A protein has these predicted regions:
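Glycine-rich SAM-binding Motif I of class I
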Residues: 33-37
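Short amphipathic alpha-helix with an adjacent loop that forms part of the alpha/beta core around
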Residues: 74-85
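Conserved SAM-binding loop
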Residues: 58-59
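S-adenosyl-L-methionine
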Residues: 1-21
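C-terminal substrate-binding/active-site "lid" region of AdoMet-derived donor-dependent transferases
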Residues: 96-171
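Conserved SAM/SAH-binding beta-strand->alpha-helix loop
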Residues: 51-52
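Conserved SAM-binding strand-loop segment of SAM-dependent methyltransferases
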Residues: 63-73
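Conserved class I S-adenosyl-L-methionine
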Residues: 22-31
Length: 171
């Protein structure tokens, strides 16, 4: 399932509704951990953020594997891939309402790589696009947390147009 919201309370409510105590959760854009703190401590949590203020706050959460890097970079994806090759939940909150193009690219690549059961995205631009678009006559629907019709085509190196990604991603 893929859920989209902008309101942070709705985003966290969607997470609480779907998360299970034993889930592997990859959180992209954890900032200082306000959403991370709402997750059960029994989850396997990998949280990533490149903001300077994130490190100090995330160090307080000993049960979280925090990575202070940019989620747009291949090296960051590779680092997480070495920790886990799949996840139950992919959480994406990169700036809340800005850069829907970047958020979608990050979603596409990370979800194609880790094949989450659920993806929850917080982004105003994507939500506005979704709420404004029509396309009901074509039946492309994913029941998982990734775009099922694309299967593995979002995994580097298969995305040739993204120069940030390399072909060194191997199991």
């Amino acid at each position: 399932m893929i859920k989209l919201s902008y309101d942070v309370k709705k985003y966290r409510s969607d997470i609480a509704e779907l998360v299970k105590d034993d889930n592997t959760v990859i959180e992209l854009g954890c900032h200082v951990g306000r959403t991370t703190r709402t997750l059960p401590e029994t989850c396997n949590i990998i949280a990533i953020d490149n903001s300077p203020e994130a490190s100090k706050e995330m160090e307080k959460l000993s049960y979280v594997n925090f990575i202070n890097e940019d989620v747009r970079l291949h090296d960051t994806l590779l680092k997480v891939f070495k920790i886990t090759q799949s996840c139950d939940m992919l959480l994406i909150d990169l700036g809340g309402g800005y850069h829907p193009d970047t958020v979608f690219k990050v979603f596409y690549i990370w979800s194609s790589t880790f094949k989450p059961t659920h993806t929850i995205i917080r982004n105003r631009g994507l939500l506005e696009f979704f709420n404004s678009a029509e396309g009901k006559c074509e039946k492309y629907v994913s029941h998982e947390g990734f775009l099922e019709s694309y299967h593995d085509s979002g995994i580097p190196p298969q995305i040739k147009e993204f120069s940030l990604w390399t072909d060194s991603l191997e199991k």
